[in-house]
């Protein structure tokens, strides 16, 4: 088990390990716990009451956070024809077709999100699947990153839409803002994410769906919250 430094241990003393905090309390507390020399990301970590081995119980979706993520998301749009212009006008950072696919094959990866129109997904999947898939960047209709409404998709991502999906342990981890956010905005984003999670509860999931929910910062300790507070 790794040993934490003095800074982390001092922060840990501010957290009551036996307390389940309200969302508002946690939003204020994590700001105190963010003492790194950069603007730490605030994340929600949720353990779900699902069997991740069953495909019908996997949780995947998107949510538009009311106050965004506090960072510029570099969006790559892969399209052709008139959809290229639509993507450019919507604010995509990079737009292209076959030539940009080749650029990625050559090692270029300076983007945070990839969207595509359905008519290019054959080439995207066959040529880029092995590169983008393991990084969670391959466009997917279930993730809301494939569609002919590519302009709308780009605008939503730029405004703070995030994708979430459970890992093989049945947990979900998602960014919900920056430590520099006012606590009220952090609380709004946390609640929006939790509502989206609950809206994606699989029909086959039994018992408590949100088994435990924690809020943490990049370098700070985690704070357990009551997701319905």
Curated annotation (Swiss-Prot):
Classification via Pfam families: Ribosomal_L1 (PF00687)
Source organism superkingdom: Bacteria
GO process terms (BP): regulation of translation; translation
Stretches of the chain forming a coiled coil according to its record: none
Keyword presence, rRNA-binding: yes
Listed GO CC annotations: large ribosomal subunit
UniProt GO MF annotations: rRNA binding; structural constituent of ribosome; tRNA binding
Entries under Gene3D superfamilies matching the protein: 3.30.190.20, 3.40.50.790
UniProt cross-references to InterPro entries, sorted A to Z: Ribosom_uL1_bac-type, Ribosomal_uL1, Ribosomal_uL1-like, Ribosomal_uL1/biogenesis, Ribosomal_uL1_3-a/b-sand, Ribosomal_uL1_CS
Keywords carried by this UniProt record: Repressor, Ribonucleoprotein, Ribosomal protein, RNA-binding, rRNA-binding, Translation regulation, tRNA-binding
Family recorded in the similarity comment: Belongs to the universal ribosomal protein uL1 family.
Function: Directly binds to 23S rRNA. Forms what is known as the L1 stalk, which protrudes beyond the 70S ribosome surface. The stalk is preferentially stabilized in 70S versus 50S crystals. Interacts with the E site tRNA, blocking the exit path. This blockage implies that this section of the ribosome must be able to move to release the deacetylated tRNA. Protein L1 is also a translational repressor protein, it controls the translation of the L11 operon by binding to its mRNA.
Quaternary structure annotation from Swiss-Prot or TrEMBL: Part of the 50S ribosomal subunit.
Name recorded for this polypeptide: Large ribosomal subunit protein uL1
